[in-house]
Amino acid sequence: MMKHICALLALFLFCSVRLLAKVYVLSIGIADYPDKKNDLRISDNDAKTIAKVFKATNEAFVSVMLNEQATKAALISRIRSVFANAQSDDAVVLYFSGHGSPGALVCYDGLLTYQSIYKEMKVCRANRKIIIVDACYSGKMRTNNQRSSYFDTQNVMLFLSSRTNELSQETRYKNSLFTIFLERGLRGGADKNKDRKISAREIFDFVHQGVITASGDKQHPVMWGKFNNEMTIIKW
């Protein structure tokens, strides 16, 4: 009898945890590169900020990689391990702040091509997949000639801080311009219909307008992918 009670209790606890574990977040920020000439000021703070936003919810499992932790091999390994836990009704969020290069993100020790990211995202079971990139030339992610058709057929949102030929602006504050508005939006500023949920369309509209205005029309965030505009990014 006691064994049955223990088994039922374990099942109940598992289900309870499962109901809360709806968002898997990997937040990456690289400000300190091996060549100091390439250092940024606040990219690691950007990653900490976005991680903190999601940690404030009861639904998120959050993993953070900063600076020398974010090598190419380690990043791919962490993507696999974090997102492997997601089930079909969950969401996964990959956030990156650092240097960008046409066709790739600049990890601590080299380039991680967008094609490699496509490959890892493709095997993830989550139906809601969000990739947010705060980096120069991040818009290249949606225009690369080798871009997989995967993003045309799967429920993946690409939210990029700038157009293909634009720089993503740092600020004198603790976060970049894009991430300042991203944080504000995720904390409720983008909740236009006041339902305590931030949708894909709401966060894009809020950040897009804020960044364009604050940058003097020099930086234009872009959104790409085939997904439901009402897809929930976060509940705040």
Annotate each language-model stretch with its function.
Residues K3, V17-W236:
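Cysteine endopeptidase catalytic domains of the caspase/legumain-like
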Residues I5-F14:
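Sec-dependent N-terminal signal peptides
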